[in-house]
Amino acid sequence: MTDQGENEKKQRRSNATIAVACLSFFVCMIGAAYASVPLYRIFCQVTGYGGTTQRVEQYSDTILDKTIKVRFDANIANGLPWDFKPMQREVTVRIGETTMIKYEAHNLFGEETYGRASFNVAPGRAGAYFNKVECFCFTDNTLKPGEDLELPVVFFVDPEFVNDPDLKDVKTITLSYTFFPIDKPRPVVNAKAVGSTRNGG
């Protein structure tokens, strides 16, 4: 009986250890899933992998005589009742020239709705040379019923584009945005205002 009792205790301890290990693994996988999205986004923005454009803080200082056509595409994921489209379907720009175009979003629903856009470039290799100075990607946007919103994009094509042998026959680049529905953004607390209230002014 004693041996049997000891075996049962060992079995229970073993089961408990396995349960804790499985739970820890599950929690780690959930954390990795949430972390993978921003990490993948950063990786793509740095490398241009998968047609992801580059994000820069300054304009190009070199403008070439060669031109390229840039087309603009707009998509809406299921569950977001918006009309979303580029205000210009395409432009022809000089390589290195900074250009601004605009998209427009309209809430078709009778309630306030919320969306966030992701983006891509085709052909994929061109993403490494498509530089955005200003864009609305990965920003939470709120639209009231019937509200319209203009969404500017400022970009240029890196002059190094012409030196890439894999892109020598590319005459057109397509910039594509897709809006996805998101939950209502949480309000941001104004720390200064809170501090002023506590101090009586």
Curated annotation (Swiss-Prot):
Pfam family, one: CtaG_Cox11
GO cellular component, one term: plasma membrane
Domain of life: Bacteria
Coiled coil spans: none
Subcellular location: Cell inner membrane
Record's keyword terms, sorted: Cell inner membrane, Cell membrane, Copper, Membrane, Signal-anchor, Transmembrane, Transmembrane helix
UniProt name for this protein: Cytochrome c oxidase assembly protein CtaG
Species per Swiss-Prot/TrEMBL record: Brucella canis (strain ATCC 23365 / NCTC 10854 / RM-666)
Record bears the keyword Nucleotidyltransferase: no
Membrane spanning residue stretches: 14-36
InterPro entries found in the cross-reference section: CtaG/Cox11_dom_sf (IPR023471), Cyt_c_oxidase_assmbl_CtaG (IPR007533)
Function statement: Exerts its effect at some terminal stage of cytochrome c oxidase synthesis, probably by being involved in the insertion of the copper B into subunit I.
GO biological process: respiratory chain complex IV assembly
Keyword Lyase listed: no
Name of encoding gene: ctaG
Protein topology in the membrane: Single-pass type II membrane protein
One Gene Ontology term of the molecular function aspect: copper ion binding
Periplasmic side: 37-201
UniProt topological domain (Cytoplasmic) ranges: 1-13
